[in-house]
Regions:
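Conserved active-site-proximal phosphate/metal-binding subdomains
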Residues: 2-148
Length: 148
């Protein structure tokens, strides 16, 4: 939330990653189903999967993720453990993930993976990006945080 953002910066954090919040905007090219999934999700709906890139990635739990699983298979785990092999496995995962992500972004069905962070619990509507930026700026001002 904007308030959490301002509070963390006041505590000494130097930055925040707000990618999930900006998916739920009219400006984002993601499907309406993806945006609505973000609005409907809570932090408990976020799981980490290593099956997309070989390293844990946060996604919204849905029927596809339940069916597909979150752990790499035995061969992939063996590949990922090897100093030289892991690069090949990650390249394979990345190429496959890019293709899958394109489909998931455009799809109106939940038959894919939708990346999202734990902040989904603080997102309750689809808003224009400019409005979100104004809300975050107002929260900074209310907390007395001066941007450097």
């Amino acid at each position: 939330t904007p308030e959490d953002f301002a509070r963390h910066l006041k505590m000494g954090y130097v930055a925040a990653q707000l990618g999930t919040r900006f998916i739920a905007t009219p400006e984002c090219r993601a499907s309406d189903a993806y945006k609505q999934a973000i609005v409907a999700a809570s932090a408990g709906d976020i799981v980490h999967t290593e099956r997309l890139t070989g390293v844990p990635v946060a996604v919204i739990r849905n029927a596809f993720i339940e069916r597909y699983g979150t752990r790499a298979g035995p061969f992939a785990r063996w590949m990922l453990r090897g100093h030289r092999r892991k690069h090949w496995m990650r390249a394979f995962y990345t190429l496959r993930s890019v293709r899958g992500l394109r489909g998931s972004l455009a799809s109106e069905s939940a038959n894919g993976y939708w990346q999202a962070g734990m902040s989904v619990g603080g997102i309750d509507s689809i808003q224009p990006a400019a409005q979100i930026v104004r809300q975050y700026a107002a929260a900074l001002s209310a907390e007395g945080v001066v941007a450097a």
